[in-house]
Amino acid sequence: MSDYLENKFLDHFLGTASTSAPSAVYIGLHTADPTDAGTGAEVSGFGYARKSMAFDASSSGTASNSAAVEFSAASGGDWGTITHVGIWDALSGGNLLFHSALTTSKTIADGDIFKVAASGIDITAA
């Protein structure tokens, strides 16, 4: 969980400020750990854009993405080696909510497509 979301969670549930859910959340691809501060290297250029991602209701402390997500093909250059994903509250800019390393890094060359299967992303409250 990001520093931003930790603060929102604490403020909301301890009654010091209210917060509302984002209208949508987006998966972003990173070539380095975005860290809890949201400062790691996100892919940019060459046709890259975050993709909206829907989640099923949580069960036993875990929520999973409800549908597959497919990014557009890298166009005009390589995206590099994707090592982490982030879940963001905006299509661009915005606030990092969650982040995690991929089980296996994936190099995206010009023309390659990055896909996430349904239930391929699990967010667990620990």
What annotation goes with each model-predicted range?
Residues 1-85, 89-126:
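Small cysteine-rich, disulfide-bonded extracellular modules of the LU/uPAR three-finger superfamily
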